[in-house]
Amino acid sequence: KTEAAKSLSDLLSMKLVRFDMSEYQERHAVAKLIGAPPGYTGYGEGGAGSGLLINELEKNPSCVLLLDEVEKAHQDVLNVLLQLMDNGIVSGSNGKSASARNAIVILTSNLGAADRERAKIGFGDTENVGVQDEAVKNFFAPEFRNRLDSVVKFSKLDRDNIDNITVKFL
């Protein structure tokens, strides 16, 4: 999934801006994205005090914005992303805002992957078809899902795919 985002950014000659959402699991981590709230260290300092997401979007308004493993982010971070997807602008805690209207936003996730791997018991399909859709539905609020343009499902990598990836990076 990450490689697909890298290929898209190369194809479109746009910078890839990647955020590993596993770094934003705590509630206070939202300040790293949009800046420190009033009264906290870093508020009003500009630069890093404005938030990493806002700074990146200011520097690269036309980019491929990759939010990797979004299911690991805290719910408050998802609320910031909802704001970004709602009107294409994200506002920082110091009033500064940045536009993402010219950015391609990609969220990757492994929601439902573990459940899909479990074999079904009984007759019929041996795969748990539809568990990924159900996992996305259960994890994201309806207003968040309604702002997604599409959901692209990736199949499990087979041995040939893994061999090709290994050769590419060696």
Stretches with model-predicted labels:
Residues 1-170:
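AAA+ P-loop NTPase nucleotide-binding core of proteostasis motors
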